[in-house]
Amino acid sequence: MNALLAVLFVLCWSSGFIGAKLGAGDAAPLTVLTWRFLPLAVALALAAALFGRARWRGLGSRAFGRQVTIGALSQTGYLLTVYQAIGLGVSTGTTALIDGTQPLVVAALAGPLLGQYVAPRQWWGLLLGVAGVMIVTAGDATSASGVSWWAYLVPFAGMLSLVAATFLESRSPTDTDPVVSMTVHCATSAVLFTALAACAGQVSPPPTASFWWSVAWLIALSTFGGYGLYWLVLRRSGVTRVNALMFLMAPVTAIWGAVMFGEPFGILTALGLLLGLGAVVLVFRAQPRGRGAGTVPTDEQSPEPEVVRGSARLRR
């Protein structure tokens, strides 16, 4: 995987936690999410109508429905829980920590669902990464005051929603143009968030420059950057590698928080960052490049003589 894409993905994805906190100071989570996706969906739909009709010709009703479901899980389900957790008082670092356990869940399910088996060295890397993200926010949950224990389950539900979307995309029988996918996902989220905000009476945006700054931040960095690069890296490198990068989200989010909000950045955060980097190195070195890398030897990936990686789509 291109190292530059990996760095950009980590920076842009982690910026979403900061954008959520920026927006939370001016409006309810549903208001922020509605205005994050409404203008974006309109712009993408207009661009598709004017310049991208050819991209949509091969998209059947079944593939369209699948992309709607992926968008609902990966954007609406995931983002709503992240924003609600931060709104309930869970820190950005702890929210990123819970998000950082995603690679372990993906690794456990990748074999039975996709035929992508995790090597012994990769398991060590995954465990090292979990240790890193736990160290980053050690004591945060116990030191936080006024936050209910169940609030920490909210981002966990969002993480599972993103995992479900990832596997649904990876098991898709046909490839969908990335621009088409992005448009469908954003339009789906715009409709769902607007409907939820209307029911809650939270559609109207506040007339403040800081609100629109947070919206611009979320559209440019988090949606086009983080979300778009997530699917690009997934297609290029597979679920294990893209999710290994999630180990870096908690420490990088902590760096964002220190720079943007003056949140403390101490020795534990630095140690967690180093462990996360070590985890990514272990996972990447133990896995062949590419999404459908063919077969892998016994000592690298599995006790079986050979394991064919990927679903029918991944092997194409």
Identify the residue ranges that each predicted region occupies:
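Specific transmembrane alpha-helical segments of multi-pass solute transporters/efflux pumps
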Residues: C12, G16-F17, A45, A49-D99, ...
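C-terminal-most transmembrane helix of multi-pass membrane proteins
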Residues: F37-L38, A138, F211-W213, F247-R316
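Glycine-/small-residue-enriched transmembrane alpha-helix faces in small-molecule transporters
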Residues: M1-T34, L40-V42, A144-R171, V191-L192, ...
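Specific alpha-helical transmembrane segments that line the substrate/conduction pathway
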Residues: T31-V42, S74, L79, Y83-Y117, ...
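Transmembrane alpha-helices of multi-pass small-molecule transport proteins
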Residues: G25-G77, P103-A110, L160-L168, M182-G201, ...
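Loop-to-transmembrane alpha-helix entry segments
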Residues: G58, A96-D99, G115-I135, S145-A151, ...
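Hydrophobic transmembrane alpha-helices of multi-pass small-molecule transport proteins
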Residues: L44, L109, V118-D140, M159, ...
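Helix-helix packing/entry segments at the starts of transmembrane helices
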Residues: L33-W35, T94-T101, F167-V191, A220-V259
